[in-house]
Structures are given as C-alpha cells and as structure tokens.
From Swiss-Prot:
SUPFAM superfamilies: P-loop containing nucleoside triphosphate hydrolases (SSF52540)
Alphabetic keyword roster: Cell cycle, Cell division, GTP-binding, Magnesium, Metal-binding, Nucleotide-binding, Septation
PANTHER family named in the record: ENGB-TYPE G DOMAIN-CONTAINING PROTEIN, MSS1/TRME-RELATED GTP-BINDING PROTEIN
Domain of life: Bacteria
Entry function: Necessary for normal cell division and for the maintenance of normal septation.
InterPro entries associated with the record: G_ENGB_dom, GTP-bd, GTP-bd_ribosome_bio_YsxC, P-loop_NTPase
Organism: Cytophaga hutchinsonii (strain ATCC 33406 / DSM 1761 / CIP 103989 / NBRC 15051 / NCIMB 9469 / D465)
Binding-site residues for GTP, renumbered to this chain: 29-36, 56-60, 74-77, 141-144, 175-177
GO biological process, any: division septum assembly
Protein name: Probable GTP-binding protein EngB
Stated family: Belongs to the TRAFAC class TrmE-Era-EngA-EngB-Septin-like GTPase superfamily. EngB GTPase family.
Binding residues for Mg(2+): S36, T58
Length: 199
C-alpha cells in the first residue's frame, strides 16, 4: 500500500529541525543494514529514502511526514561507513544529540541484520538508548536472505544475550524489504502508539 509520505528536509543539527508536535519515530542501525530499503518498503514509496550499496549513504537527519499524522526520521548509520574518523564522531554526536533532545521523539527503531549474531556496536547502541531512557524496539532486516531456521537461531542468540541484562526484552520485528514481510505489523504498532498519544 502506497502511503502519503513526503520528504521534509535534511538537517545536520537537531536544533535546526522544525518544531513538530506530531509523534516522531527514528530509524537507526549499522551502515548498510537496509534502513533506507525498509523505509521505502514500509511506506510503499519507491526511492523515498535514497538507497545505496555503499555503506554510509545517509549522513544527515532526514525527516519525512507520513499520512500527515506522524514523522519518520532516517538517521545516519554507524559502523562500516567509509568516512574519516572525525566525520564518524561528528555523525555520532549529531545522532545522540537528536535522540536525547528531540521533544516529540516517540520511539527509536534500531535495525539489525538478521544474518548476524549480536554485534558489539549494536549492543552499545542498545545500552546507550536504555541508559538515556529512550524507548526503542528492534527490527531484524533481510530475513529473506536466509532460511527461517537460521533466522530463529539468530533471534534466539539475541534473546539470550539481552536476557543477561534485561528482565523485559524490547519488542522485536522480523522484516524483509523485498517481500514486505513484517511491515504491516510494524505499521500497526506505530498506529497503536499514535492512538495512545491522541487519547
């Protein structure tokens, strides 16, 4: 289903982002985790978010309005981006400043590649979000690239690692940008939160 999704603008500082009262959902993950592809699949709008086979394509805070009811924030990835260390530090600071200070931020969706065991950089992001009291959920991407058995194996590994420090695990979604699997569940979750906020 094609949604009414429109690009607002890109920003290199959260303070330059427009003041918006609508609930905002941020998407973040390692470089090349499939973030832009998932956003396009989620909204049904091809090339809404620019995709690239090269890690580090997204370098700014990109805001989109969805159905004129909520805001989607596409944030720079972390990890393998082919950029100088100073640039990566700058991006990291920009993202963390946004996440800590964006007043209408409702939830962060942290994307992880379903083909990989828990990685240090992902776990560090989870720890940082939790320590700063920022609500988040996990989205496992690219489940179409492997068997269901392998996906379940990776999911079990994540559950085991997170259970070592968490009594209640974050909500998890299994998705595929190719088939669209999981996008309906994700949109339903966002819609439920929006209704709770409205009430």
């Amino acid at each position: 289903m094609k949604m009414n999704a429109k690009f607002i603008s890109s920003y290199d500082d959260y303070q330059k982002c427009p003041e918006i009262t609508k609930p905002e959902y941020a998407f973040i993950g390692r470089s090349n985790v499939g973030k832009s592809s998932l956003i396009n699949s989620l909204t049904g709008v091809k090339n809404l978010a620019m995709t690239s086979s090269k890690p580090g394509k997204t370098q700014l805070i990109n805001l989109f309005t969805i159905e004129e009811t909520w805001i989607l924030a596409d944030l720079p990835g972390y990890g393998f981006a082919k950029a100088s260390q100073s640039s990566r530090i700058k991006w990291g600071r920009m993202v963390h400043d946004y996440l800590k200070n964006r007043t209408n931020l409702t939830t962060v969706f942290l994307l992880v590649d379903s083909r990989h065991e828990p990685m240090k950089s992902d776990l560090e992001q989870i720890t940082w979000l939790a320590s700063n009291g920022i609500p988040f959920s996990l989205i496992f991407t690219k489940i179409d690239k492997q068997s269901l058995t392998q996906t379940n194996k990776i999911l079990a590994s994540w559950t085991k690692v997170l259970s070592e420090n968490w009594e209640e695990l974050p909500k998890m979604f299994l998705t595929s940008s190719e088939s669209g699997k999981g996008t309906e569940e994700l949109l339903t979750y966002i819609d439920e939160i929006n209704k709770q906020i409205a009430n």
